[in-house]
Amino acid sequence: TAGGDLYGIAGNASYQYAYTIYVLPYSIIAVSITTAVFPRMSRAISEHRIGDARADLSSSLRSTGLAMFFFTAVMIAMPVPLVKALIPSTNVHGAILISGPLIGLLVGLVPTSAFLLVQRAFYAYEDGRSPFLFAAADNAVQLLLLLTSLRFAPPKYWTLMVALSLSLSYIITFPWVFWLLRRRFGGRIDGKRIIIMHVKALIAGAAACACGLFLNPLVTRLVGAKVSSVNGHMSWWQSIVICAILTIVVTAVYAGLLWLMRVEEFSSLIVTMKARLLRRTSTATSVSTPAESETEEAQAQN
C-alpha cells in the first residue's frame, strides 16, 4: 500500500473495490444501450442512411447521459453507506478508504460512458484509427496528470489521484473525439440537443447530490450509525436503510428538476413508463375477467 501504512492509507485493494462499484452502472446501462444500438447504427451507415444513424447516436448519448448523471449523483451522495451495503465484510474505516477513489472515478462516469457509444460509432464506419488516437491522447493526459499530482500530493492521496486522473483525462480529451466524430457525420451530429440535455442533467444532478450530501450525516445519526476512521460503526442493515432514504431523496430532487427544466428525454421516459403500466394493468384485467365469469357461472349452476 502507498506510503507504507497498510491500514491507514488507501491502496490497490481499495482502488479495485472502488472500480468494481463504479463500473456497475456503466456495465448495466451504458453497455446495454450500446449493445442494442450498435447493430442498428451499423446497418444505417452501411445503407448510407446517415440521418438515421445520427438520430440513433444522439438519442443513445442523451439517454445514457441522463442515467449516468443520476447514478453519479446518488453514489457520490452516500459513498460510505453504499460501499458498506455492497461489501458487507468491510468495516467503516475500510469503506472510507474505498470511498475516496470511488468518488474520483465517479467524476468521469458520464464521459466514460459516452465514449463507449462514440467508439462504436467509429467502428460502425469501420474506423479503428480514431478511437486509437483518442485512447493514446487520453492515456498521455492521464499519465501527465497523475505524475504531476504524485509530485505534489502526499502519499495518502495517491490512490485518489489515480482515480481522478482517469476521470479528468476523459473530461479533457472527450471534446476532441466528439469533434472527430462530428466530421465523420458530415459536420452535423445533433450537438446542440446533446449539449443542452447534458447541461440540464448536470444542474439537476449537482443539486440532487448536494441535497443527498446534506442529509447523509443526519440520516446516518438517525439510524444510530457513525462514520469515522477511529470509532465508526455501521451495520449492513443500517447501510441499506441509509441508502434507501438518500436514494429516494436524490431521485425526487433529480426528477423534479428535470421536469421543471422540461428535459425531453425525461418526459419521454415518463410517457413510456405510463404506457407500460397501463398495458400491464389492462392485460391483468383481461386475464382476470374470464376467471371471474367462470366463477359466477359455477355459482349460478350450484
Write out the residue ranges for each language-model feature.
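Membrane-embedded alpha-helical bundles of multi-pass transporters/translocases
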Residues: 1-302
